[in-house]
């Protein structure tokens, strides 16, 4: 150990070992360092023990937060006169120096730096700072956790500060979070407090039920068939020779002798009953058909020839109707009567009333002319 250092603690020993060694006079440190609370370092300075401070390690460290106090040992807080409390932060003369009670309240000292206020009528609070305003008079009118505000009682009316998800004068209305219809694909929206949830139908998932579940994820199709996902369903595109929902069925192989003349594509076979006299053979008495009479209907609907026939028939019908209407209108404008007993193409005038205007009326069929207006051949006037 270097000369001139007398250490009484293990901490100081570690300090000495870590410090660089240099020659120091023995009386440079020991003469002024408080060796009860520290030790001399090789550089001649005092190294204080934990809880002590100062140039010579002569001062203890107070409790953190101690305001008006001192210590005799480390981490103490001994209050000065007139102060109290754990941190010596409470004034024992609080009611005499400057009363904390407001609005005319009376301060009562309880000892240990504590006090209480006796408030006048109409006021309350620790320091009589609150007035019995609209909130107190209404008796906590705000609902669903709302906070009543009346400017500490000095406002004329109160207001309710509502929590998220509620509205109204007293926070009594729960906001309908399903009003905007956030759930998709026919899902049911369940309203909550400032939130909603979607009850998804089968085949959908997600917060808004927008995810179509993959029904092909479990690989339901057999025989190596390709799966096509649908809404809560799937289709299997089966290879040739297989059928069924999951291609689990093996289709029978058709007889080439009976299907050689059948065109490709899906067909519907219908057996046509025989008509006319039926030849009988001796013994059996059954119908003998050498060639099967089969009618096959393609699924494509009308053929091209049938569609053309329908269009031509419609055009001819429309032309005939239009021609008949035009001819009838033309004959009516020229005064030509069609064959029939109810039309008189030209009016008749009496000889004595020629060159005068007359009202023309149509006579019923078979009605004779008046005797004073006999018809005069060659004396007619066209309309």
Curated annotation (Swiss-Prot):
Regions of this protein lying in the Cytoplasmic compartment: 328-383
DNA-binding found in the keyword field: no
Positions of glycan attachment: 157
Positions of transmembrane segments: 307-327
UniProt KW keywords: Calcium, Disulfide bond, EGF-like domain, Glycoprotein, Membrane, Repeat, Signal, Transmembrane, Transmembrane helix
Domain (EGF-like) ranges: 27-58, 62-89, 91-129, 131-172, 174-210, 212-248
GO cellular component: membrane
One protein family per Pfam: EGF
Alphabetized PANTHER family for the sequence: CRUMBS FAMILY MEMBER, DELTA-LIKE PROTEIN
Name assigned to this protein: Protein delta homolog 2
Species of origin: Sus scrofa (Pig)
């Amino acid at each position: 150990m270097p000369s001139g250092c007398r250490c009484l603690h293990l901490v100081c020993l570690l300090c000495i070992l870590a410090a660089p060694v240099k020659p120091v006079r023995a009386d440079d440190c020991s003469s002024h360092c408080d060796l009860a609370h520290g030790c001399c370092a090789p550089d001649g300075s005092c190294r204080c023990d934990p809880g002590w401070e100062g140039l010579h390690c002569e001062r203890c460290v107070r409790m953190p937060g101690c305001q008006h106090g001192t210590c005799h040992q480390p981490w103490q807080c001994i209050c000065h006169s007139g102060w109290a409390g754990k941190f010596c932060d409470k004034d024992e003369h609080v009611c005499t120096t400057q009363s904390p009670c407001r609005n005319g309240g009376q301060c009562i000292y309880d000892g240990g730096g504590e006090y209480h206020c006796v408030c006048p009528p109409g006021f309350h609070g620790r320091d009589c700072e609150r007035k019995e305003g609209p909130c107190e008079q209404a008796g906590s009118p705000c609902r669903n956790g709302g906070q009543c505000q009346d400017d500490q009682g000095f406002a004329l009316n109160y207001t309710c500060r509502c929590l998220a998800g509620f509205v109204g004068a007293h926070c009594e209305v729960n906001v309908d979070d399903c009003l905007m219809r956030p759930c998709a694909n026919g899902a049911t929206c369940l309203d909550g407090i400032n939130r909603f949830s979607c009850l998804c139908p089968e085949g959908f998932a997600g917060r808004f039920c927008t995810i179509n579940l993959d029904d092909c994820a479990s690989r339901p199709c057999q025989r190596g068939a390709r799966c096509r996902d649908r809404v809560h369903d799937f289709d299997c595109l089966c290879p040739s020779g297989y059928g069924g929902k999951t291609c689990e069925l093996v289709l029978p192989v058709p007889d080439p002798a009976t299907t050689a003349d059948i065109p490709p594509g899906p067909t519907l076979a219908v057996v046509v009953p025989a008509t006319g006299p039926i030849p009988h053979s001796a013994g059996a008495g059954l119908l003998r058909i050498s060639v099967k009479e089969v009618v096959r209907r393609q699924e494509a609907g009308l053929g091209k020839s049938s569609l053309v026939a329908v269009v031509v028939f419609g055009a001819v019908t429309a032309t005939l109707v239009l021609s008949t209407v035009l001819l009838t209108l033309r004959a009516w404008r020229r005064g030509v009567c069609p064959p029939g007993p109810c039309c008189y193409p030209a009016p008749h005038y009496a000889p004595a009333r020629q060159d005068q205007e007359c009202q023309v009326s149509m006579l019923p069929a078979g009605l004779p002319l008046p005797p004073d207006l006999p018809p005069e051949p060659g004396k007619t006037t066209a309309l």
